[in-house]
Amino acid sequence: MTEDQGFSDPEYSAEYSAEYSVSLPSDPDRGVGRTHEISVRNSGSCLCLPRFMRLTFVPESLENLYQTYFKRQRHETLLVLVVFAALFDCYVVVMCAVVFSSDKLAPLMVAGVGLVLDIILFVLCKKGLLPDRVSRKVVPYLLWLLITAQIFSYLGLNFSRAHAASDTVGWQAFFVFSFFITLPLSLSPIVIISVVSCVVHTLVLGVTVAQQQQDELEGMQLLREILANVFLYLCAIIVGIMSYYMADRKHRKAFLEARQSLEVKMNLEEQSQQQENLMLSILPKHVADEMLKDMKKDESQKDQQQFNTMYMYRHENVSILFADIVGFTQLSSACSAQELVKLLNELFARFDKLAAKYHQLRIKILGDCYYCICGLPDYREDHAVCSILMGLAMVEAISYVREKTKTGVDMRVGVHTGTVLGGVLGQKRWQYDVWSTDVTVANKMEAGGIPGRVHISQSTMDCLKGEFDVEPGDGGSRCDYLDEKGIETYLIIASKPEVKKTAQNGLNGSALPNGAPASKPSSPALIETKEPNGSAHASGSTSEEAEEQEAQADNPSFPNPRRRLRLQDLADRVVDASEDEHELNQLLNEALLERESAQVVKKRNTFLLTMRFMDPEMETRYSVEKEKQSGAAFSCSCVVLFCTAMVEILIDPWLMTNYVTFVVGEVLLLILTICSMAAIFPRAFPKKLVAFSSWIDRTRWARNTWAMLAIFILVMANVVDMLSCLQYYMGPYNVTTGIELDGGCMENPKYYNYVAVLSLIATIMLVQVSHMVKLTLMLLVTGAVTAINLYAWCPVFDEYDHKRFQEKDSPMVALEKMQVLSTPGLNGTDSRLPLVPSKYSMTVMMFVMMLSFYYFSRHVEKLARTLFLWKIEVHDQKERVYEMRRWNEALVTNMLPEHVARHFLGSKKRDEELYSQSYDEIGVMFASLPNFADFYTEESINNGGIECLRFLNEIISDFDSLLDNPKFRVITKIKTIGSTYMAASGVTPDVNTNGFTSSSKEEKSDKERWQHLADLADFALAMKDTLTNINNQSFNNFMLRIGMNKGGVLAGVIGARKPHYDIWGNTVNVASRMESTGVMGNIQVVEETQVILREYGFRFVRRGPIFVKGKGELLTFFLKGRDRPAAFPNGSSVTLPHQVVDNP
């Protein structure tokens, strides 16, 4: 059988999981399971304990960490035990000093030495002056030996004249229980040292007292008193074990909460970091921060805004680079759509790496065009140099595509320096873009360039300061725009050897570490893997992997690099699992140490006397905190009453009141216990009782009342027994001899005070009440016993002392000798008793123990409040992290489709990894504002063009708001390109895009399959109506030119480091041509699209054949409207943004 076995108690498991379990986000790539089991230890010295008391964490490393934490927490309670020992020494000093005589010198000196040692030990432990190993391994046992020695020295030196079986039994029981609640040891050693102490104490008393017995009757009385001692010790040990279990469970709960909270926090932080990295790979940080700030605004604040928020910033003196693949059409014809996208993905991933190397901000990828900017958002003086180096590296990088495809592809690069307006437009699918006349110039610089060369403008040339050799570019001869604007252009001469040196010097060594060349040409292989959901993932191997493959081709014995990589990945995951577990445990230990050193309660968050939180709201939250261990606390009261009854029955077996109070009290306490445990085990009790129990747990005054009832029952049982005993054994009063008392409880009345000590123990076990309530209850116990000791039982204790110490004197003479403050006789002899009268010593003992337990209760409440504050702090931290994650997630899903964002947030992706999804039946739409170019100016009246873009932002935002309509839920915005809006329908793989219940395409009719295309056509008509509404309100005359098409596409993301979602294929190209060759104010479609949409009631006008670049002549139609209204899910029409409804 294994050492640890799964814990199978259904009740406990349900409660434990309900208290401690948390929902952890799935994280398959972490490599380590985040669920840890609470098991039962089936070996060791505590095997005799119940299963629920033998808890252990799995794995063993977690249990070891917990034991370190638990002992560290208990180390502070060790100081409490030192205080207990010091109070006991003070008690002995007082008891010896008030009746000082020559025979009291030895116990007085021993107690004084013990007190000094206690103080020294307290200071050493408090200040941390002892080595950690000594403090945790040696001091607990040393303190136990010191306390045990003090008890036995007090027993042997103070009671040397006449020993009794009850001597120091109360103190022994007190310290045995104290060992369980204070010593920073495991349960097994505490049980062992406690049992050893009790056995030795019992044997010493039994042997010593037995030597003084003179007849058989006294022997029977001794036997009953020894058995009473055993029950006192047994009660202290049982309740001590339960208190240890309760403390262990409370700390396990705090530890597990800390562990799981740290796991969740780390997981959320990791996911939040992934989201932030993804977000910042698409948007610059200053734009993303501004967006997050606005997203957190209240809806009321947003409603007060007159216009939609626009995130646009002006950046001056930046260099803009446009790069286009020359021969892309030839390349497209040589590759399938998927192969082409994989090729572009790998190429643009390399460009992204180069962009990071040369401090470029990638703006967008438009088909085969790549453009970026240097000097944004942070200004760089060498922005022009960086852009030139970037262009040269891109020209060199395209060579591997040329070699692989055996085509004449090349790069044409244009660079211009000027001012841009950078930001995002619209409210959905945010993408960072730049606008300005200088951006147009940079675009024309690329168009007027030469393949394989970097074409720069005069403004860029002015920023180079002679860093590169150039030659005239003559761009005006190849581009009418450049010729019209009179822009001088140049071509970079990159053939000279000093270019690499210039690259390093121009970047001050920052871009090219260790003198590495700008780029390294390679011809990597493209690996494709098909996923079950139909998506294709492709990874381009790095240059190092390509070299390995070449080596493998030359040498057949060379190991397969792919297989080695897979094996290495598997080994890395195993190592990562172990490292993650070790890292988490280390972080947990640091977090726990940080908590402990924070001393949160000592920062005056609480009042000094009452220990209540200064914040009333915090105090209210603490007061309603449920205490799951209240049932165990009340069960301790039942154990205490049982042992109390056994002790009293053994001392006085003839007194019937002992039996009656035991039965009645036990029944009442069982009722209280059941009512408290119903909330812990709800399936075992009626619903009404469970509800009542839960109400008690969360209601402070009800908890206090329940606790007071339990202690009141214990006190009344003891008081009734004491008073009944007095009445039963009181004989007739005689003037000469006093009260004649004999038999039963009169033989040793100290035991009734000892059982009161058990009532004090039961009081501090009440975990659901505050230390002030416990103090009140302990004052009740101590006050009741004190009143009986000093008044009702005064003659009882006097008679007991007389029989023990002055057997031959009459009671009146003995009473005279028992005066504590009497002076020595005239003859020089001491006529006082050798001890303080028992009625006073027992009373003082009760008060000392009460003060000790009150001190411990304050410590326990401070710990409980500290754990509560830790819990609140951890909860608040998780809430803050979760809130940030939620906003980041909202921002990320507004930049990428949700299913695509989940793919990239799930695990770390390689830079060249491709996410793609093939679709056979998709609708694509392009909608542009051709006359916006005439509207846009950069005059000062328009704030350099910003106000023009603000108006464009309003138009695009209104288009975006249409997508919130349930009718258009199947439509996905792809992107905006300047003033062109691109959308598609049916590109969400995990949603039934057609809105019908048919599960397979074969089972659907054509009308079902193409419903999303009809929705896209309705969306295009709604965009036209929206623009008309905007024109009417702004007195403008903007017109849309829209093109639509249907067919198959490949949707996916290019570049995992800087993901760019787009769709590719012939369908997209034709839709784009339908827009560019269209007529303003019309929606142009090809014949295949017209045939499908006609079935949905759309009206068309035949335009006729038109020439489309790359496609020849195509028959096209203009979509004019719809005869039948669209079938909206709720029967309502589309509400246009800012629509003004005319009242009849």
From Swiss-Prot:
Tissue expression: Detected on cilia on the olfactory epithelium (at protein level). Detected on cilia on the olfactory epithelium.
Locations listed in the record: Cell membrane; Golgi apparatus; Cell projection, Cilium; Cytoplasm
**Catalysis performed (reactions):** ATP = 3',5'-cyclic AMP + diphosphate
Co-factor requirement: Mg(2+); Mn(2+)
Q: What EC class does the entry list? A: lyase
Q: Does the keyword Transcription apply?
A: no
Any keyword Acyltransferase? no
What effect is documented for mutating K465R?
Abolishes sumoylation. Abolishes location at cilia in the olfactory epithelium
Q: Entry's InterPro entries? A: A/G_cyclase (IPR001054), A/G_cyclase_CS (IPR018297), AC_N (IPR032628), Adcy (IPR030672), Nucleotide_cyclase (IPR029787)
GO CC terms for this protein? Answer: acrosomal vesicle; apical cytoplasm; ciliary membrane; ciliary necklace; cilium; cytoplasm; dendritic knob; Golgi apparatus
GO terms for biological process, alphabetical: acrosome reaction; adenylate cyclase-activating G protein-coupled receptor signaling pathway; cAMP biosynthetic process; cellular response to forskolin; flagellated sperm motility; intracellular signal transduction; olfactory learning; sensory perception of smell
Superkingdom of origin: Eukaryota
Q: How is it modified after translation?
A: N-glycosylated. Sumoylated. Sumoylation is required for targeting ot olfactory cilia.
Which residue stretches are annotated as topological domain Cytoplasmic?
1-79, 402-630, 854-1144
EC number(s) on record?
A: 4.6.1.1
Co-factor remark: Binds 2 magnesium ions per subunit. Is also active with manganese (in vitro).
Give the sites modified to Phosphoserine: S523, S578, S1076
Glycosylation sites per record: N734
The record lists ATP as bound by 324-329, 366-368, 412, 975, 1062-1064, 1069-1073, 1109
GO terms of molecular function: adenylate cyclase activity; ATP binding; calcium- and calmodulin-responsive adenylate cyclase activity; calmodulin binding; metal ion binding
What family classification does the UniProt entry report for this protein? Belongs to the adenylyl cyclase class-4/guanylyl cyclase family.
Q: What's in the domain note?
A: The protein contains two modules with six transmembrane helices each; both are required for catalytic activity. Isolated N-terminal or C-terminal modules have no catalytic activity, but when they are brought together, enzyme activity is restored. The active site is at the interface of the two modules.
**What name goes with this protein?**
Adenylate cyclase type 3
Q: Which organism is it from?
A: Rattus norvegicus (Rat)
